[in-house]
């Protein structure tokens, strides 16, 4: 609305000679309100990156609509889903239904309508997707199921594209994103072949993109905003400790035994090329490196075992995210190219977390782990916006979350709020490895930092507080990338308490 039009609306009797003064008096408060509603200005930031993860969309949340969805083109799905009489958002312990998905995507647009780039760090499909489909449709024909999976992927892509029409949207596969079930994605397999066109169109790239998506579920592309910055997307499902088990239990997937080493070789070549071309690199992937702190703490009860327990029993309870060989080699690559790799982005854990990698010093490596949209693990749905500088370094980030999950639906809209801005909440100058390492140290020594970390970890959810006995296991995962490093923090430490994470 123009100044004159706003004046006529707000002060219709205003004399023309007073319009300039009136314009200032009327619009200055509006400008101040608008500035307050948006994100805070970032130091030297030139663009914003929108990151979402772990949607785990379940189009079958209302079983009465499934037959129509099966028969329809993805372009017709929204009309069908809008007919659902189940109006409530998915709640804690559930994957994302249509109402939550729509609300989350709309909140992303409101928070940042024109990001330089959108990243989705994996897991489009709901947990137990094959089982749910079979239980509702009673259709055991593999071709029918695969068609429904592909329609689901295409529908999510359509919804993202509808809201971010002119923006590159980058996907990376999650462990649930496959026809054959969890952790069973295959190099050159049917799922990667069938989704290549969708992933390429979202990324607004050409055929070279499709080739590496099909073969490895990975790709390399130039940053759309920053000259001299490259983005490498890695299908880290191949490196998962659970990938080998899945490959032997899903006979519908043809597993390439060399996929993990092929991916590492591909990464090493791309990093070498980037260094030679004087490019900087962002990495994105689904499963982060290091130790699964949640899985580790649950089978090993430190309280019942005593203060420190048996070192042997503690060590055997440690659950790695990746096969140790791939973790060690990845760690070595990050150390070798620490001046090239500027940041890494991951998902998978559903919580707001981070990893600090390598020794102290310049260019400390780190991984930002993005919160999930799905509230299945009792955290609040969330997403983040990252501000980056012209040289590819990160200035800051702001996390948004759904504040009224259990009450949203029907006439009650979802209330998405800014949860925190990194530099302000943690009182650090910028988003980098040094700041994250400082926070890691403060969590161990200051109760206020520890409590803040735990609060943000669950995206401000109080649905399932973290037991005191589990805190140290989660804390040690921040810096304990390898199993020996994690054990030295977790297994040899005193039982966690208020003074010791």
Where are these regions (language model features)?
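Core catalytic region of metal-dependent phosphoesterases/phosphodiesterases
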Residues: 73-183
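Bacterial N-terminal signal peptides
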Residues: 23-33
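N-terminal secretory signal peptides that target proteins for export/translocation
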Residues: 1-19
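Active-site-proximal segments of metal-dependent phosphoesterases and phosphodiesterases across multiple
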Residues: 241-264, 274-341
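Active-site environment of divalent metal-dependent phosphoester hydrolases
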Residues: 58-61, 126-129, 171-182, 240-242, ...
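Metal-dependent phosphoesterase/phosphodiesterase active-site architecture
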Residues: 40-120, 191-230, 235-273, 277, ...
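Well-ordered, non-membrane alpha-helical segments in soluble/globular domains
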Residues: 142-158, 192-197, 260-267, 323-330
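Active-site neighborhood of phospho(di)ester-bond hydrolases with catalytic His/Asp-centered motifs
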Residues: 51-53, 116-123, 164-174, 283-286, ...
